């Protein structure tokens, strides 16, 4: 899981895979 998804979204593929969204 992306530890920075609240402030910064990981690379798009990882962001999507981890269920995070860009701010």
From Swiss-Prot:
Keywords: Disulfide bond, Hydroxylation, Secreted, Toxin. Disulfide bonds join 2-10, 5-15, 9-20. The modification 4-hydroxyproline is found at residue 12. The cysteine framework is VI/VII (C-C-CC-C-C). Displays a mini-granulin fold, a structure composed of two short, stacked beta-hairpins connected by two parallel disulfide bonds. This newly described fold is derived from the same cysteine connectivity as knottins (ICK fold). The name 'mini-granulin fold' comes from the structural homology with the N-terminal region of the human granulin. Negative results: Does not affect sodium channels Nav1.2/SCN2A, Nav1.7/SCN9A and Nav1.8/SCN10A, acetylcholine receptors alpha-3/CHRNA3 and alpha-7/CHRNA7, calcium channels Cav1.3/CACNA1D and Cav2.2/CACNA1B. Does not impact cell proliferation. GO terms for cellular component: extracellular region. It comes from the Eukaryota. Expressed by the venom duct. This is Conotoxin Tx6.5. GO terms for molecular function: toxin activity. Belongs to the conotoxin U superfamily. It is found in: Secreted. Its main location: secreted.
């Amino acid at each position: 899981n992306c530890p920075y998804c609240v402030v910064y979204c990981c690379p798009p593929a990882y962001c999507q895979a981890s269920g995070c969204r860009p701010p």
